[in-house]
């Protein structure tokens, strides 16, 4: 087990001395903290730690038990994750009504292109139930008559299936901090724009109205700030002068699925590190096999350094 693979997450009410109590318990068991981050949103406290457990002087289950008991005493939930515990990750897909991304993820898992077990499809509408059930994946409709999701029920489903990764495959609702904090850097969303441009709803329409020449899609980790999480992959496409919204959407949707699948594969391969809001490839990852951002073809067409060329100064200035 490597230090970077051991994560501890604390979620609950803020309390004086909480951090000291938890870190002391870890130090007493030979666990060194390599990175610690904390935040408060809507009255909910979150602390995440990456720890070096190679010198741990206790068993894993004893550590989990001790932290759970301390969490109950402090009124918080403490999770310990050893991703090396499982060879196959468990994935939940959240959707609303659009099917193209869900279908792509289900097909990729069924074909073995993604080394993952999809154990739940969660939605705020019942529209895509038949698609999930056709792939023998349990479907959970957590929305009311207006489509508002019950996030407490979502948390129950995620816990019931012991979910490692949540994929928002065109899920048209904003996740609250009670979910985002518990699954930090484990929720991937695909958004139909080249973020940070055009966040929020109707991104293709926003792009059309602003007259952009190039539009695109972004797969990113989810944070409590809408469409501002660390970017994993992006795809771009040309927007013709006379393109209608439906035509832009038709160009973008296949790329949404492509960017999302690549982001999932990068995450499952443990190739992505996140630091201060930016993704990077982990040390030791083969850059020829994995990459972040645009495809190599797109990068080749957009050089990072100016291209030298002869310029006819008189022609530019209108001289003879």
Regions found by a protein language model. Name each.
Residues 10-18, 95:
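Short, surface-exposed ligand-recognition loops at beta-strand->loop->(often short) alpha-helix junctions
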Residues 15-34, 67:
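Short amphipathic alpha-helix segments
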Residues 30-44:
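N-terminal glycine-rich anion-binding loops that anchor highly charged ligand groups
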Residues 42-44, 48-320:
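One-carbon transfer enzymes
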Residues 14, 35-37, 194:
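Short, well-ordered turn and helix-capping elements at secondary-structure junctions
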Residues 2-12:
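Short glycine-/aliphatic-rich beta-strand segments at the starts of folded cytosolic domains
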